[in-house]
Amino acid sequence: MYGTIAKMRVKAGMEQQFLQIAETTESVNVPGIVAVYVYQMDANSREFYMTVVFESKEAYVANANSPEQHQRFLQMMTALETEPEWHDGAVVFANA
């Protein structure tokens, strides 16, 4: 499995819109996607972390390079102060 962790700072007052966008994105049938988790930080309610897990690095890269994902990214950016900080890598342990 392979995926990304994104650190995001949401614009003031846009927290609900951001979550709606994230939920809409979650409902799209993205090939190879295994799981999506969104965390809202206790220390700062405008700071979110999103983890996205794919079956493989190839599935992740295919999604990242797709025009559909680019459109979802642009929609998400309407609620964010700046671009997310991305951390990509292999899943080396999971227990669900």
Regions found by a protein language model. Give the residues of each.
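Glycine-rich beta-strand-turn "strand-cap" elements at beta-sheet edges
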Residues: 2, 35-49, 72-96
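Active-site-flanking beta-strand signature of metal-NTP-handling nucleotidyl enzymes
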Residues: 2-8
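Conserved short-loop catalytic and cofactor-binding motifs
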Residues: 6, 48, 61
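Short, surface-exposed ligand-recognition loops at beta-strand->loop->(often short) alpha-helix junctions
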Residues: 9-20
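Short coil/turn motifs at secondary-structure junctions
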Residues: 11-13, 41-43, 55-57, 94
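An amphipathic, aromatic/His-enriched active-site/gating alpha helix that lines ligand/cofactor pockets
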Residues: 24-35, 53-87
